[in-house]
From Swiss-Prot:
Gene: gltX
Protein name: Glutamate--tRNA ligase
Pfam families in the cross-refs: Anticodon_2 (PF19269), tRNA-synt_1c (PF00749)
Binding locations of Zn(2+): 97, 99, 124, 126
Quaternary structure and partners: Monomer.
Amino acid sequence: MITTRFAPSPTGFLHVGGVRTALFSWLYAKNNNGKFILRIEDTDLERSTQEAVDAILDGMSWLGLKNDGEIYYQTKRFDRYKEVIQELIADGKAYYCSCSKERLEELREYQQANNLKTGYDGKCRDANYIPQQGESYVVRFKNPQDGVVSWDDAVKGRISISNHELDDMIIQRADGSPTYNFCVVVDDIDMAITHIIRGDDHVNNTPKQINIYKALNANVPIFAHVPMILGPDGAKLSKRHGAVNVMQYREDGYLPQAILNYLVRLGWSHGDQEIFSIEEMIKAFNLEHINASPSRFDFEKLKWLNKHYIKESKFDDIQTEVEYHFAKTGLDISNGPDLKELVAVMAEKVDTLVELAEKSSYFYSDDISYDENAVKKHIKASTGEIFVKLLENFEALDAQQWQDPDVLHNIVSTTAEQCQVGMGKVGMPLRVAITGSGQSPDIGITLKLLGKNKVVARLTKALEELCK
């Protein structure tokens, strides 16, 4: 069975680059009716935090990238790593090393001074050293000294590294903890991982890991090293370009559907298609069409996609996110129009859900403030008479008539005729009075969504405060 994994280290937030790797791994597993494993690589005890673990799990959950089976934690597998280390020592494929930090530092300085390749010189490799109680030691892997490590990378093609370039790396530290390059191999073997899709910053780790697979007589997985994501300026994507923490995108009003759609096309192509449902992503995804060159993050394109999903999604699919952002503003959504109806009206005018909540606040809050420029531009000496006439005409409407935007629009038009002024001389002051600004959806729709009671109350207030 095809089995992939996403194996983040909980030393910070869930980065968009990590999300893309997780997405590619998840899609490849789903495309092949396989399994997607989530593994938390928390062996760095000093830097790993529970807060970071929670951020990873929250991000994966928000995006809908559900793992199959349990979540694995490396810190819960230390006994297994020690067991395998002892097997390697017993088989003569690993050894105890007693070299002190001082000796290794002197060795490194000597190598640098003489333009030699830096790395461990193998002093303890064949010394048959057995540590005594109280002695400090590490365990090193006996890397092959001859030959070449080669693999056919699913993204980068054939890659070969001479074993002469690799030294005997430490697989168990002096404090007894196992090291990253060793743990991941044991994990991938035990979890039957068949395909490893990860960032190309791991390419240099791959030959070391392949040698451990072979030493353990295990099948070597297929590797697919995905290029990094660059900022718009071509530099590595970082905080200075904008949000890189995926949950910050939620706070900024982006939908998970938009994030996934954007990231799947960032370095992977399927003809000219830009919009993908999750089902379409799963059906179309393959490793062959991952681009070997880095991709630049385009924030404007992400915003365009987000707008598309706000406009085109079924309300049920985005309701949780819409309600989340309205809750953040403190607005009482029971004091206004149905959110489903509101989104249908406002979607064309916003790029994010933050904008949606902000630009719709006047529908739910009775405490509206007037935009000074809009008041100055649209409220004139004659506006009071217009408001009086509007109130008279609105009061005459029954509840059923108030549900028809066309009827309401006609009332505004009729009022303009009665006052012998143009439509704009009525519609724009009315907008300012009931929304606080000169911008809103179609006036008939705005009136309907606000409801008769709010409109009458706000017109009355505006008449008293703005038309003195």
